[in-house]
Amino acid sequence: MGSRSSHVALIPDVDQIRRETGFSQASLLRLYHRFQALDREEKGFLSRLDLQQIGALAVNPLGDRIIDSFFPNGSQRVYFAGFARVLAYFRPIDEDDATLRDPKQPEPLNSRMNKLRFAFQLYDLDRDGKISRNEMLQVLRLMVGVQVTDEQLESITDRTVQEADEDGDGAVSFLEFAKSLEKMNIEQKMSIRILK
């Protein structure tokens, strides 16, 4: 097995990744070590199979969809920069960063709106900008498994879509999705404290 150093300078494009993700150098170093540990064959990239070894994703009902987010546009590999970018959505929001942020700069990946966009994409499988009843049903089925009957699940799905669908088109747009989650503390629910 090759040498695995603990120096942040060994991370390719570390400064750009730090700017894009908002992770500190210490957090990036921890993530890089995790990336290397998952890359058991030292290929320099991760495959879906590598990510399926993460226990928290293996037991998460949306684990496969979260793993899919690491591989946009049908790619089969994720390099460290892409790995860090996806995990940045789960970085806790630092209120100091929010007040000091330059409004001319793009919103950080871990902002409330970007966390909501990430969550929305877990539902919007066909990427048409709307969550159809069928897409909602698929996600709810993953989340509840066999704990409810198909009839109950159909009813829950219909009620969920109906409550969020303000324009009556039978689907949930991103704005409707965001509005339906206004009162939810998405910042806390989509945060991994160990990465701070």
Curated annotation (Swiss-Prot):
Intracellular or extracellular location(s): Cytoplasm; Nucleus; Cell membrane
Residues annotated as binding Ca(2+) 2 are D165, D167, D169, E176
Q: Does the keyword Transferase apply?
A: no
Q: Which UniProt keywords apply?
A: Calcium, Cell membrane, Cytoplasm, Lipoprotein, Membrane, Metal-binding, Myristate, Nucleus, Phosphoprotein, Protein transport, Repeat, Transport
- Tissue expression: Expressed in brain, lungs, stomach and intestines (at protein level). Strongly expressed in the epithelial layer on the small intestinal luminal side.
Q: What positions carry the motif Nuclear export signal?
A: 137-148
Looking at the UniProt record for this protein, which Gene Ontology cellular component terms does it annotate, in alphabetical order? cytoplasm; cytoplasmic side of plasma membrane; nucleus; plasma membrane
**Could you state one GO biological process linked to this protein?**
positive regulation of cell population proliferation
Phosphoserine modification sites?
A: S27
Lipid moiety-binding region for N-myristoyl glycine? G2
Which intervals hold domain EF-hand?
26-61, 111-146, 152-187
Oligomeric and partner information: Interacts with PPP3CA. Interacts with SLC9A1/NHE1; the interaction occurs in a calcium-dependent manner. Interacts with SLC9A1/NHE1.
Instruction: Please give the PANTHER family that the UniProt record associates with this protein.
Output: EG:114D9.1 PROTEIN-RELATED
Q: Which family does it belong to?
A: Belongs to the calcineurin regulatory subunit family. CHP subfamily.
What is the annotated role of this protein in its UniProt record? Functions as an integral cofactor in cell pH regulation by controlling plasma membrane-type Na(+)/H(+) exchange activity. Binds to and activates SLC9A1/NHE1 in a serum-independent manner, thus increasing pH and protecting cells from serum deprivation-induced death. Also plays a role in the regulation of cell proliferation and tumor growth by increasing the phosphatase activity of PPP3CA in a calcium-dependent manner. Activator of the calcineurin/NFAT signaling pathway. Involved in the cytoplasmic translocation of the transcription factor NFATC3 to the nucleus.
Name the record gives this protein? Calcineurin B homologous protein 2
Q: Give the organism the record lists.
A: Rattus norvegicus (Rat)
Protein encoded by which gene = Chp2
